[in-house]
C-alpha cells in the first residue's frame, strides 16, 4: 500500500515544550573589543596633541577609535523636515566653551566586554597638566544597556549583570501540523564609536543646517572667563582644579558649598573620576554624593545643572546600586522636571543620556514610563520627527539630533516592559512620530541613520503580541468568522467545505485599511510593512535589519487571521521575499536567525507555498547544507530552516526533490543525533519523518542507507507516535 505524504505531523500538544522565540543581541565579535579607561585616555591625549601641532589656535577635540562598532560613524545626515533648525550633517562633537575657563566634557564611547553592551560616558577632555588646555567641548550623551537572561515571554530585558547568552524562549503555537510561531522582542540599545567631524565657525551646535563638513570655531580657555553670564565675579579655570588636590571626599563636600563654582568643580571632578575609576562610584554613594547631585539639578545656574547631570550619568553607569539610589533620592523626577523646563541643548543631552542609562534597570521602568515618557515624547520625539496633527500645545522648539537619539534609546529600553509597551501604543502621536521619522529617512536614503535603528527597535517591540494585546480589525473579522462558523455548524451534522476553519485560514475577506492610520493602527498597516521591507533592502546595519525582520516576525506570529493576512501582504502584495532571503546570506547570525524565523512563520500558510518555493526555498535548503552550527544562534536557525522546508515540502515535493542533496540529507540525519541542539534535533526528526512518508523523497533517504528502523531509532516513540500509526 502506498502512503500519501503527510500534510500534517504531530498534534498541537507535541510542541508545547518547544523553545522557539528569539532574542536580539549584539554579535559576540563586536563585544570582545573592550578597552580600559587608561588606554582610552592615552588615545585621547595622543589625538589631542596631534591636532594641537597642526592647529595651535583651534580647540582640541576628542576622538575615539571605532573598534568594531556596528556603526560606520556618528556623522549622520539629517534633512530639513520637522524643524527648520535641525542639522543636516550632525556631529557627535558639538562646539562648546567653558564659561569658567576650565574644560567641559565630551561624550566618549565605553565598551564593556564582559557585560556585552555598548554605551557612553561623559568624560572630561582636558584634566590636569598632562592634557593641553586649548579646547572646550560640549558634553556628550550616554547609554547604559545590556541584557537579562530569564524574562517572561522571551523578551530581552536590559539588566546590567547577565549571562552572555542572554536568551530565554517560549513558543506560541501555530495550527495543527505547523511549526510553532515565533514572537520576537528586540530591545538592546547600542552606541557607536565616535569620529571627529569638522564644523563651520559661528554655527550654533544644535542648529547646523549645511550638508558640507563644517569647522569648529577656535576657542580658548583663559583664566579670567566668568563663571556665568550674570556672575562676572565668580571665576575659575582648569589650573584652579589642577592645584586644588581634589579627592572624591573633597569633591562631595564641594557639592554642598554655597559657591556655585565650587559646586560645579565638585560635580565635574566626580564626572571625570567615575569615567576613569569604577570604585569611585561606590565611594560617592557611600559619602551621600548622589543626594547632593540630585539637589543640584534644581540649581538656577545652568553650568551647575549640566555638571550635576553629567556626574549622575556616569555614576549610574553599570551601577544598579547607584541607579536605585538616584530613584530613592527623587532623581528621576528632578531630571525629568529639568528636562521639561530647560532650553539648553547641552543639558538636554546630559539628561536624556542619564534617563537612557536609568532605563536599563527593570525596577525603574515603571516610574520612567510614568514620569519621563510624556516629556520625552512631547519635548523631543514628536517635535524632532516633524509629525504634526495640528496640536499647537506641543513644543516646537529646535531639538538637537543627539537629544533625539538618546530619547529614542531610552524608549527602546522602556518598550520592553509590558506596561511600557501598552502605554506607548496608547500615547498620542508617539508611534506616528517614530514611523514618520523612519519613513522620512528611508525616502531620503538615510537608512543607516543611527536613530533609525532605535526607532525601528521601538516599533519592533511595540509589535510584540500585537494581535493579542491590541484590538485590531483582524480580531474583529476573526470573531465574526468564528460566530458564523458556530452558527452554521450547529444547524446540522455536515457543513460546507468552504466553511471549515482549517489551519486558521478563514473564508472571509481581509479588513479594509484606514487611509490615514494613527497610533497602534500603524503597526499592522501596509505602509508600515512596505517601509520595513524598503529599509530591509537598503540598510547595511545588522541591528536595523534584525529589527525590521523582528517586527514582521511578530506580525506573522499569531495563530489567527492576522498572521495569514500579514504573511500574504509581505510575500504577495509587497513582494518582500527577496529582501528576506537576503538576510539568510548575512554574516551576522542574529540577522540570519531573524530571517529564518520570519520565513518559518510565513511558511505555515499554503497560499504562499508556491511563491516561497521559487524565491526562498533554495536559500533555506542551503542553510541545512552549509550552516556550520558554530554560532550561538545555530540551533534556532537550523530549527527554523527545518520547519520551513517541512511546510513547503508538503505542498511541493517535486520541487523539494530538486533542491535536496545527499549532503543536506546527511546533515539532517546528523542533526537528529545532536544532543547539544535539542530543538533543532526535534525539528530535523519531524522533517525526516515527512521525507520518509513522501514517495518522491523516500528514495533520497534510501540512497543514504536510511531505513525505517533508523527513523524510529532517531525519532523515538513520543515524537513519532502519529507517524508510526500510519504503518
From Swiss-Prot:
Cystine crosslinks: none
Entry annotated with the keyword RNA-binding: yes
PTM (free text): Phosphorylated by AKT2; required for interaction with YWHAG and subsequent localization away from desmosomes to the cytoplasm. Phosphorylation of Ser-119 by AKT2 promotes PKP1-driven cap-dependent mRNA translation and decreases intercellular adhesion, phosphorylation is promoted by insulin. Phosphorylation by RIPK4 at the N-terminus is required for its role in differentiation of keratinocytes and DSG1 localization at cell junctions.
GO molecular function terms attached to this record: cadherin binding; DNA binding; RNA binding
A single GO cellular-component term on record: plasma membrane
Localization terms from the record: Nucleus; Cytoplasm, Perinuclear region; Cytoplasm; Cell junction, Desmosome
Region (Required for WNT-mediated nuclear localization): 161-270
Region (Disordered): 48-69
UniProt region (Required for binding to single stranded DNA), positions on chain: 1-235
Region (Required for interaction with EIF4A1) residue spans: 1-287
Alphabetical list of PROSITE patterns matching this protein: ARM_REPEAT
One GO-annotated biological process of the protein: ameloblast differentiation
Keywords recorded for this protein, A-Z: Cell adhesion, Cell junction, Cell membrane, Cytoplasm, DNA-binding, Membrane, Nucleus, Phosphoprotein, Repeat, RNA-binding
Region (Phosphorylation in this region is required for cytoplasmic localization and protein stabilization): 54-69, 117-192
InterPro entries given in the database record: ARM-like, ARM-type_fold, Armadillo, Plakophilin/d_Catenin
Pfam families recorded: Arm
Predominant subcellular localization, coarse grouping: nucleus
Per-repeat ranges for ARM: 244-275, 276-317, 318-360, 361-412, 413-443, 505-536, 537-583, 584-629, 630-693
Phosphoserine PTM positions: 4, 119-120, 122, 143
Complexes and interactors: Part of a complex that contains DSG3, PKP1, YAP1 and YWHAG; the complex is required for localization of DSG3 and YAP1 to the cell membrane in keratinocytes. Interacts (via N-terminus) with KRT5/CK5, KRT8/CK8 (via rod domain), KRT15/CK15 and KRT18/CK18 (via rod domain) as part of intermediate filaments. Interacts with VIM (via rod domain). Interacts with DSP. Interacts with DES. Interacts with FXR1; the interaction may facilitate the binding of PKP1 to PKP2, PKP3 and DSP mRNA.
Membership in a protein family: Belongs to the beta-catenin family.
Functional summary from the UniProt entry: A component of desmosome cell-cell junctions which are required for positive regulation of cellular adhesion. Plays a role in desmosome protein expression regulation and localization to the desmosomal plaque, thereby maintaining cell sheet integrity and anchorage of desmosomes to intermediate filaments. Required for localization of DSG3 and YAP1 to the cell membrane in keratinocytes in response to mechanical strain, via the formation of an interaction complex composed of DSG3, YAP1, PKP1 and YWHAG.
Protein name: Plakophilin-1
Organism: Bos taurus (Bovine)
